[in-house]
Amino acid sequence: MESEGFSATTEQYEYYDYANETGLQPCDETDWDFSYSLLPVFYMIVFVLGLSGNGVVIFTVWKAKPKRRSADTYIGNLALADLAFVVTLPLWATYTALGFHWPFGSALCKLSSYLVLLNMFASVFCLTCLSFDRYLAIVHSLSSAKLRSRSSILVSLAVIWLFSGLLALPSLILRDTRVEGNNTICDLDFSGVSSKENENFWIGGLSILTTVPGFLLPLLLMTIFYCFIGGKVTMHFQNLKKEEQKKKRLLKIIITLVVVFAICWLPFHILKTIHFLDLMGFLELSCSAQNIIVSLHPYATCLAYVNSCLNPFLYAFFDLRFRSQCFFFFGFKKVLQGHLSNTSSSLSAQTQKSEIHSLATKV
C-alpha cells in the first residue's frame, strides 16, 4: 500500500499533498484546529529569540575581528544561517494562522522555502567544519596551521555556502503557489518536470537529498572527528597545558552544539524517512499509523526550528569568553567586573583588569 503523501501543510521543506496522490482513497483527515492556534505563536517566539540572539552573536563576532578564533568565524556564519531562516517565520506564522493560506505571492513562497532549506544545510555544514577545526587543533595541532589559516577558513566558508545554495535549489525551483478551494497554498509543483505518476520518485529523491547530505553524512563525520579527539584528550588528560585546556573547553561547547542539533533534527528526519519508505513501498503503514505521523510531523518540524534560536543561548551559558565579549562590546563592563569578582575573588585589581580585556579579545 502506498502512502497518501506527507501533507506539507505544516512542513516547510517538502510540502506534500496529503489528499489523493495516486488515486488512492485518502485516510481520515487530521484535525488541524489546535495547530492553527499553537504553531503561529510558537513560530513568533522562535522568531523573536532567534532574531535577537543570533543578531547579538553576529555583532559580537564581527566586533572581535582582530582577535577572532577560527571557531568564531564558523559560529558567526552559523548564526547568519539561523538569522536568514528566522526572518521568514512571520510569513509561515501568518500562513498557518490563516488556515494554510499564502497571501504573499509566488516570489516570497519560493524565497522563504529556499531560505529554510539553505539554513538546514549551512547549519550542519558549519557544525561539521567546526568539528573538523577542533580535530585539527587537538589531534594535529602542530601540522595543521596551514589548514586552519584565515585563507583556508574563508575558502571552506565559500564552499559551505555554495553547496548549501545548490542543495537548496530544488525548493527555489519547484516551490510555487496554487489555488486549492478558497486558499492559495505554497506547494511543491512537479508538473514542469514530471508526470503525476512519477511524482513519488521526485518526493523520494528530495527526501534523500535532505536527509543524507543534510543530516546523516555530516553526523557520521562529526562522530568520527570526536572519536579521534576523545582518544587524544584521554591519552594526554593529565598533562594538558593551559592552551590545551582552552581548546578542551571550546571542544565542550562545540560538542554541545552538535548534540543539540542532532536532538532537534532527529525526529524530523525519522518521520520523513518513515514516510519515504512507505511512499516507495518498503513499508505498509495503516491509516492510523499515517495519521500519527501526520499529527507528529508539525511538532517535529517545530523542534527543528527551535535549533535556530538555541545556539546563542548555548554560547552564553557554556562559553565565558563569549559572555565576556558581549558584556565588553555592549558596554556592560561593570557587569563583567562583578562576574569576574564572584568567580575569581582572589584576583587582584590589576589582574582583574587585564582579565577583562583578555576574555573580551584574546584568541
From Swiss-Prot:
GO BP annotation list: angiogenesis; apelin receptor signaling pathway; blood vessel development; branching involved in blood vessel morphogenesis; calcium-mediated signaling; cell differentiation; gastrulation; heart development
Ranges in the topological domain labelled Cytoplasmic: 60-77, 133-152, 222-249, 319-363
Membrane topology designation: Multi-pass membrane protein
Disulphide bonds in the chain: 27-287, 109-186
Principal location: membrane
Gene Ontology, cellular component aspect: cytoplasm; external side of plasma membrane; plasma membrane
Domain of life where this protein originates: Eukaryota
Residues carrying a glycan: 20, 182
Entry-linked InterPro entries: ATII_rcpt, CCR1-9-like, GPCR_Rhodpsn, GPCR_Rhodpsn_7TM
Subcellular location: Cell membrane
Molecular-function annotations in GO: apelin receptor activity; C-C chemokine binding; C-C chemokine receptor activity; mechanoreceptor activity
TM stretches of this protein: 39-59, 78-98, 112-132, 153-173, 201-221, 250-270, 298-318
Extracellular side: 1-38, 99-111, 174-200, 271-297
Keywords, comma-separated and alphabetical: Angiogenesis, Cell membrane, Developmental protein, Differentiation, Disulfide bond, G-protein coupled receptor, Gastrulation, Glycoprotein, Membrane, Receptor, Transducer, Transmembrane, Transmembrane helix
Tissue: Expressed in all blood vessels including the posterior cardinal vein, intersomitic veins and the vitelline vein network.
PANTHER family, per the entry: APELIN RECEPTOR (PTHR10489:SF953), CELL ADHESION MOLECULE (PTHR10489)
Record-stated family: Belongs to the G-protein coupled receptor 1 family.
Protein task: G protein-coupled receptor for peptide hormones apelin (apln) and apelin receptor early endogenous ligand (apela), that plays a role in the regulation of normal cardiovascular function and fluid homeostasis. When acting as apelin receptor, activates both G(i) protein pathway that inhibits adenylate cyclase activity, and the beta-arrestin pathway that promotes internalization of the receptor. Also functions as mechanoreceptor that is activated by pathological stimuli in a G-protein-independent fashion to induce beta-arrestin signaling, hence eliciting cardiac hypertrophy.
Name assigned to this protein: Apelin receptor B
Source organism of the structure: Xenopus laevis (African clawed frog)
Name of the gene this protein is made from: aplnr-b
